[in-house]
Amino acid sequence: MVIVEGVVIGGNRLGRKLGFPTANIAIDDDLAVENGVYSSKVVVEGEEYVAMTNVGVRPSVDGTKRLLETHLFGFEGLLYGLKLRVELYDKIRDEKKFSSVNELREQIAKDSNQIKELMANG
């Protein structure tokens, strides 16, 4: 397990448009975590949530700066400016460039289902 802590910053809100709002945290390029999608847990203000986290440059939206984006299952509300503790567990796939927003949305939904199942089974 790798732990990343940081303050939530604003993003382009694409995750929200896709039905998976994310909390974004700026990370150092030298963070010793491979780019990809991870099962995770996030602690915010003492509450723990199962989460889906992407570490990388977001090639489908022509991103260039490395970023951690995490979607907290069951969380409602805004996280901007709050400090999060993100615990990365299993890498489920590499980061990849998708040919369309719909293809990206479909893959995120698959990732979500896989992570929920993985975390439910321990």
Residue spans for each PLM region:
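Phosphate/ribose-recognition catalytic cores of enzymes acting on nucleotide-derived substrates
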Residues: 3-122
